A protein has these predicted regions:
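Juxtamembrane intracellular "pre-TM" segments in multi-pass secondary transporters
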Residues: 5-18, 197-235, 257
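Short amphipathic helix-loop junctions that connect adjacent transmembrane helices
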Residues: 41-57, 248-265
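Central cavity-lining transmembrane alpha-helices of secondary-active solute carriers
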Residues: 62-78, 270-283
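Conserved MFS/SLC helix-loop-helix module at the cytosolic interface between two early adjacent transmembrane helices
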Residues: 73-109
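Helix-to-loop junctions at the C-terminal end of transmembrane segments
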Residues: 74-86, 279-293, 380
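C-terminal ends and interior cores of transmembrane alpha-helices
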Residues: 96-109, 303-317
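Cytoplasmic helix-loop-helix junction between adjacent transmembrane helices
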Residues: 117-156
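A membrane-interface helix-boundary motif in multi-pass transporters
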Residues: 170-183, 378-396
Length: 411
C-alpha cells in the first residue's frame, strides 16, 4: 500500500495510511453535504406547525438546541466506546442513526415527529468526536493541525455543495432535501463498511469503560481539571455560544430581514464553506509557518468579532451586502479557529485518551450550542434582530481575553 511519509523530530519514521486518510476525508465531505443539504429548509418544514413568525423562530432554535442537548450526552459515551472498541464500529452505527434521523424529520406530520428526528440525529451526531479521534490516530502530532485543516476544508466543500443543492431541491418539496440527506449519509455508511480501516490499534485501547467516561458532567469536570486544557476549553465555550445562536437563528433571520427563499438561504452556508476551502488552501498553510495554534485561534476570534459587528449593522439597516461581507469574515474566522483549537486539544493528551478528550470537547461545544440557540432565539424575538450579533461581539471578546491570558500564563 502506498503511504504518505512524515518524520518527527527524532527522525523516527511515521506513516499515514493513505486508505484511512482518504476514507476520513470522503466521510467528512459526505457528512458536510448531508448536514448542509437540510439547512435551508428547516424553517419552512416548521412553518405548518406554528402560528406566527415569533413562534416559528422559537421552534427552529429549540430544534437546534435539542440536537445539541443529545450530542452533549452522547459524545462522551461515543468517544469512550471508540477508545474501547475502535473507531470503525462507532462511526458506522452513528452514520446509520443520522440517516434515520433525517428520514424521520423529512416525513414529519407533527411537531413531535420533527423533534424525534432531531433527537435521533443528535444522539448519533456525537460521532464528530470519533472522527477527530480517527484523524488523531492516523496523523503525527506535529502535523495534526495541518490535517485538521484538511478536514475543515473538505467539510467546507461539502457545505458549499449541500446548502446549494438543498435550496434547489426545495423546489420539489421542502422534505426532499431531508430524504436526499438521508440517502447521502446512508451512502457514507455503506462506503465506510467496505473501505474504512480501523485506526485505533488494540494495544492502544482502554481495557474497560467506567461510568465516569459515560457521564458528560464528570467527563467535563475531569477534562476541565487539566490545567493545559482549561482555558482553551473555556474560551472555546464562550465562542461557541454565539456561534450556536447564529446557527439556530440565521435561516429565520434572513427570512425576516431580507425575505430570502430556500435557494438564497443555501447561499449563506455555501459562503462559509467557500471561505473554509480558501482559508485551508491558501491561508492556513502560511499561518502555520509563522504562528502558533493559539495565535491562529486568537486571529480567528478577532475575525469573528468583526463579523458579528457587520451582521448587527446589516440587521439594523436591512442591508444584505453588509450581511454577506460579515458572513465571509465569519467564515474565515471559523475556518482557522476550528483546526487550531482541535490541534491544541489533541496535542495535550496521548493516543489512548484521544476519544475521551475529543468527546469531552464536543460535549462542551454541544453544551454551548444548547444554550446559544435558546438565548439567541429569546433575545431575537424580544430585543430585535440585531441582538444575537451584539451578544456575539461581547462573548467572543471575552473568549479572546481568556485565551490570551492563558497563553501568557503558560509562557
Amino acid at each position: 500500500m502506498f503511504k504518505l511519509r512524515t518524520h518527527n523530530k527524532q527522525k523516527k519514521e511515521q506513516t499515514i495510511d493513505k486508505k484511512a486518510l482518504i476514507f476520513g476525508l470522503i466521510s467528512v465531505f459526505l457528512c458536510g453535504i448531508g448536514f448542509g443539504i437540510i439547512a435551508p429548509v428547516v424553517p419552512f418544514l416548521v412553518q405548518p406547525y406554528t402560528r406566527n413568525l415569533r413562534e416559528q423562530a422559537i421552534v427552529v432554535t429549540l430544534l437546534i438546541s435539542v440536537y445539541a442537548f443529545c450530542v452533549f450526552f452522547a459524545a462522551p459515551g461515543l468517544g469512550a466506546l471508540s477508545d474501547r472498541y475502535g473507531r470503525r464500529p462507532v462511526l458506522l452505527v452513528c452514520l446509520l442513526g443520522s440517516a434515520m434521523g433525517y428520514l424521520i424529520f423529512g416525513i414529519g406530520g407533527a411537531l413531535w415527529i420533527l423533534f424525534a428526528g432531531r433527537i435521533i440525529e443528535g444522539i448519533t451526531g456525537g460521532d464528530i468526536s470519533t472522527i477527530f479521534a480517527y484523524f488523531a490516530d492516523i496523523t503525527p502530532s506535529n502535523q495534526r493541525t495541518k490535517y485538521f485543516g484538511w478536514v475543515s476544508a473538505v467539510a467546507g466543500a461539502g457545505t458549499v455543495i449541500g446548502p446549494t443543492l438543498g435550496g434547489l431541491l426545495a423546489k420539489f418539496g421542502y422534505s426532499v432535501p431531508m430524504y436526499v440527506g438521508a440517502g447521502v449519509t446512508l451512502l457514507n455508511a455503506v462506503y465506510g463498511f467496505f473501505f474504512m480501516p480501523e485506526s485505533h490499534h488494540k494495544n492502544n485501547r482502554i481495557k474497560r469503560i467506567t461510568f465516569v467516561r459515560l457521564n458528560p458532567f464528570t467527563q467535563l469536570a475531569s477534562i476541565l481539571s487539566m490545567k493545559n486544557l482549561k482555558r482553551i476549553l473555556i474560551s472555546a465555550f464562550l465562542l461557541w455560544i454565539p456561534a450556536g445562536s447564529l446557527q439556530g437563528i440565521i435561516s429565520q433571520f434572513v427570512i425576516d430581514v431580507f425575505s430570502w427563499t430556500p435557494a438564497l438561504i443555501g447561499l449563506i452556508f455555501s459562503i462559509i464553506g467557500i471561505q473554509d476551502i480558501l482559508s485551508q488552501a491558501f491561508i492556513m498553510p502560511k499561518l502555520l509557518k509563522k504562528l502558533s495554534d493559539a495565535q491562529i485561534a486568537m486571529l480567528g476570534m478577532v475575525s469573528e468579532i468583526i463579523a458579528y459587528g457587520f451582521i448587527a449593522v446589516s440587521a439594523l439597516l436591512s442591508l444584505y451586502p453588509v450581511f454577506i461581507i460579515g458572513m465571509f469574515i465569519f467564515g474565515f474566522g471559523d475556518s482557522i479557529f476550528g483546526p487550531s483549537f482541535n490541534g491544541m486539544v489533541s496535542k495535550s493528551v496521548d493516543s489512548s485518551e484521544q476519544g475521551r478528550v475529543q468527546g469531552g470537547s464536543q460535549s462542551i461545544q454541544a453544551l454551548a450550542r444548547i444554550i446559544g440557540p435558546i438565548i439567541g432565539g429569546l433575545i431575537y424575538v424580544s430585543l430585535g434582530h440585531a441582538a444575537p450579533a451584539f451578544m456575539g461581539v461581547l462573548l467572543v471578546g471575552a473568549a479572546l481575553v481568556v485565551l490570551y491570558n492563558g497563553v501568557c500564563v503558560n509562557k
